[in-house]
């Protein structure tokens, strides 16, 4: 499987661990990622907050570059990039809007632009959770996780066209395939951006109340709010690890820690990792004891 790849700007800096673990997981699953040549920023939130035409022009340029390279689909790990790229294509169905966008570009966009999908969608819908489960070498048994999607991955539904907008399950299903226990989490699509950090704190507190050992995300901005600003959000030290779903996937697939970027997390995942190791050791010891019992009976 091959895919044109749009990394997004945050993957080059604040969410480098997401970028690193995404590439590592895709390599392990033999999903080829061909980075779009000369890609540029999609504008993120500031661009579309200022000017919809400018925002669409920034995204359309990247889609046009992918089209010129023969791509039919573009994959990106970042929900903000995903939303901008998909929204640009959606708006450019209107000829008058497309003309305004093309007026800002050196080269007009083709009428048919590639489809944009999230890496999460590719893993769930194209690769499949059953196939992922077959690749697991180190099951995530013994841990409970709360999957937090944020507000962009599946909304607005008519543009994103992925998962259930109110109760998405893609990450839940992947975590289950990896052997983790997924706790119920009614705040999974609430926005984590709040000037007083009240909602961010509420998300973390509810995850803890439901028994989660970690919060799993697929969004760099969500990760920053829940990990970097955790102390501010909860008014103290909660020590709730917040990991990208690709980091836990890589761990379950048996990939080296250095390929997954655990060292970049603000809240240390060491206790979580020890819990996984302990569950594996207990399982191995139980299997060895059963084997010894069977031998004794023989």
Give the residues covered by each predicted segment.
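Iron-sulfur cluster-binding electron-transfer modules in prokaryotic oxidoreductases
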Residues: 1-298
């Amino acid at each position: 499987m091959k895919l044109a790849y749009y990394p997004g700007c945050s993957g080059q800096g604040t969410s480098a661990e997401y970028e690193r673990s995404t590439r590592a997981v895709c390599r392990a699953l033999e999903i080829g990622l061909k980075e779009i040549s000369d890609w540029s920023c999609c504008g993120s939130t500031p661009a579309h907050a200022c000017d919809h035409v400018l925002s669409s022009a920034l995204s359309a340029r990247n889609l046009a570059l992918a089209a010129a390279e023969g791509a039919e689909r573009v994959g990106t790990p970042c929900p903000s990039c995903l939303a901008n790229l998909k929204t640009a294509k959606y708006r450019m169905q209107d000829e008058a809007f497309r003309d305004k966008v093309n007026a800002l570009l050196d080269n007009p966009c083709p009428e048919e632009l590639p489809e944009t999908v999230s890496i999460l969608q590719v893993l769930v819908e194209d690769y499949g959770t059953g196939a992922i489960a077959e690749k697991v070498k180190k099951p995530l048994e013994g841990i409970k996780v709360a999957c937090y999607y944020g507000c962009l991955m599946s909304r607005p539904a008519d543009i994103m066209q992925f998962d259930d907008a109110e109760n998405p399950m893609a990450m839940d299903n992947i975590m289950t395939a990896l052997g983790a226990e997924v706790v119920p989490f009614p705040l999974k699509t609430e926005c984590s951006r709040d000037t007083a950090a009240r909602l961010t704190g509420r998300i973390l507190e509810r995850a803890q109340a439901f028994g989660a050992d970690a919060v799993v995300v697929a969004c760099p901005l969500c990760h920053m709010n829940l990990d970097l600003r955790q102390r501010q959000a909860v008014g103290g030290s909660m020590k709730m690890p917040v990991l990208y779903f690709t980091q836990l996937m890589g761990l379950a697939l048996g990939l080296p820690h250095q390929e997954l970027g655990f060292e970049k997390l603000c809240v240390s995942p060491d206790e979580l990792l020890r819990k996984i190791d302990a569950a594996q050791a207990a399982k191995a010891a139980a299997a060895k004891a059963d084997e010894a019992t069977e031998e004794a009976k023989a």
